[in-house]
């Protein structure tokens, strides 16, 4: 059965895109069939995969997630097969649906849509889902209708948290949205785990991890992601950390193994 996982945190700069990309590739390396979905108008995941330039503009005229959402609510030219929106990245051997800056208008064109919180869920057809073991959604740093769509479409959520000062900013509101979706729209939605990122050897980082252990005793990942320059280098080369021999790549592989174990025992 396909598991759909949202990588979400209202706070920006916590490693959502890096986590989505590298967890996805790590799962792929275990033999899982993986689809990445870029649900952020900044399109950082699409840039990581070489689909957009540094300004978030597509390098060609191929359709993106914003086109697909407009089709789903009847505002665009209808394409009969959702799979036409899927791209394959050869370098990382992974499928993805890209984003672009036009997704920034999503709140406007979703405002009048029927069941606007379920548009993404309806886009992920049974035929599409049956092709994958995992679908990973890279969410934007916001609490708007796009995040609601991601959560309603998902089975679970992973929250990356930067192990630095102000790490808990926005977590309360995200937890509130999570509880709201779980109570009213997606009862089976689960918190797969909280992932400390950008961990270093400072006392501040150690304090944040201790606070996370207290706040999420059962959900905190055993693995942490350390701060390292390799993350930026990997993005610039459009190649997952998991394809190099480095500490961060091994950490993301360990996170993927934890996800698989948690899904088995859930």
Locations of regions flagged by a protein language model:
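P-loop NTP-binding core
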Residues: 1-266
């Amino acid at each position: 059965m396909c598991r759909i996982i949202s990588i979400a945190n209202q706070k920006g700069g916590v490693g959502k895109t890096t986590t989505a990309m590298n967890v996805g590739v790590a799962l792929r390396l275990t033999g899982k069939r993986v689809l990445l979905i870029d649900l952020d108008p900044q399109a950082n995941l699409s840039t990581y995969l070489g689909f957009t330039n540094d300004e978030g503009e597509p390098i060609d005229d191929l359709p993106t997630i914003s086109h697909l959402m407009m089709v789903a609510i009847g505002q665009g030219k209808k394409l009969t097969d959702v799979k036409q929106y899927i791209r394959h990245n050869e370098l990382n051997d992974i499928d993805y649906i890209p984003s672009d800056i036009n997704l920034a208008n999503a709140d406007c064109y979703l405002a009048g849509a029927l069941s606007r919180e379920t548009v993404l869920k309806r886009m992920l057809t049974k035929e599409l889902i049956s092709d994958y073991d995992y679908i990973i959604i890279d969410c934007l740093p916001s609490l708007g209708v796009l995040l609601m769509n991601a959560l309603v479409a998902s089975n679970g959520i992973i929250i990356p948290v930067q192990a630095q000062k102000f790490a808990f900013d926005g977590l309360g509101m995200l937890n509130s949205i999570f509880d709201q979706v779980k109570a009213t729209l997606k009862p089976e939605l689960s918190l797969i785990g909280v992932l400390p990122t950008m961990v270093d050897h400072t006392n501040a980082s150690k304090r944040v991890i201790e606070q996370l252990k207290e706040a999420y005793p059962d959900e905190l990942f055993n693995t942490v992601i350390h701060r390292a320059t390799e993350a930026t280098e990997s993005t610039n080369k459009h190649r997952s950390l998991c394809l190099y021999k480095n500490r961060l790549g091994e950490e993301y592989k360990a996170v993927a193994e934890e996800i698989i174990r948690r899904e088995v025992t859930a």
